[in-house]
Design a protein with these regions (language model features):
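Metal-dependent amide/peptide-bond hydrolase catalytic core
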Residues: 43-48, 53, 59-265
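Acidic/histidine-rich catalytic neighborhood of metal-dependent amide-processing enzymes
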Residues: 1-54, 262-265
Length: 265
């Protein structure tokens, strides 16, 4: 007993997958079938015991803070957009308490709202900036409407701007609503659990994550995908790495799946 194997090498995952799997699913949906065991090796834990079946909604917010530039020696003549941005970043922590629902399926179990990137403003030290732009990465539990989080962010921004005499524009630069999760008893989840048990002698369990993978696109197309690999918790950190031993052990698990060895487990 052996399973036919298909391998999809797709681009653009970090920026929305419009030119990668999204393009493939749109133009060649015949390549995939609801009976396929679709495994995306893009998330996991150090023991190789997490099978990801659900992902949070993703939204990237862009905040443009507008003030009035002036010479730094006469700050009263301007409106400091950097100070406004700093105040707003601090105020936006209120989102955590407004949307504090928890779901134990996910790690972490709550929605997260994290300021990440700030664009350069003035090139010199002696100028009060009149415009600052920063971004916030939001990973929102599926039951929370993204529209409500945008509205809350704008309400918080309005409070800061009215106090400081600034203008703030809040834009959703990227949104990806959560797909329906892969059922924990889906065939692909069971097959992975049996293969992990046979190869590694460990029990793997279904879980959800805040990160985004191409599995979301499969799920939105009605294809129950699972995400699995053995991963050291170093994603997007300095000196990100994986261990060769983990890769070799994962290869054995995939070989077990390919050969149908999980059926005998």
């Amino acid at each position: 007993f052996e399973r036919p194997v298909g391998l999809a090498l797709v681009a653009d995952e970090e920026t929305g997958s419009r030119c990668g799997l999204g393009h493939l699913l749109k133009h060649r949906p015949d390549l995939f079938n609801v009976r396929d065991l679709i495994v995306v090796p893009d998330a996991g834990n150090e023991e190789g015991t997490m099978i990801e079946v659900a992902e949070k909604s993703v939204m990237w917010l862009r905040f443009t803070v507008k003030g009035r530039a002036c010479h730094a020696s006469t700050p009263q003549k301007g409106r400091n957009s950097l100070y406004g941005a700093a105040r707003l970043i601090t105020a936006l922590r209120e989102l955590e308490s407004r949307f504090d629902a928890a779901d134990p399926l996910f790690h972490p179990p709550v929605s997260t709202f994290v300021p990440t990137r700030i664009e350069a403003n003035v090139p010199n030290v002696n100028t009060v900036p009149g415009k600052d732009v920063f971004y916030m990465d939001c990973r929102v539990l599926p039951q929370v409407p993204l529209e409500s989080t945008v509205a809350a962010a704008r309400e918080i921004a309005a409070g800061v701007t009215s106090e400081l005499g600034l203008e703030v524009v809040v834009e959703a630069e990227h949104t990806e609503a959560a797909a329906d999760p892969t059922p924990a008893d889906a065939p692909v989840v069971g097959a992975l659990q049996r293969a992990v048990r046979r190869v590694n002698g460990r029990e793997a369990r279904a879980a959800g994550i805040g990160g985004g993978t191409v599995a979301s696109l499969f799920r939105k197309a009605g294809l129950p995908a699972a995400v699995w690999m053995t991963a050291r918790d170093t994603a997007h950190q300095a000196n990100e790495y994986c261990l060769i031993g983990d890769v070799l052990q994962d290869a054995k698990v995939f070989a077990c799946l390919f050969a149908g060895g999980d059926v005998l487990a």
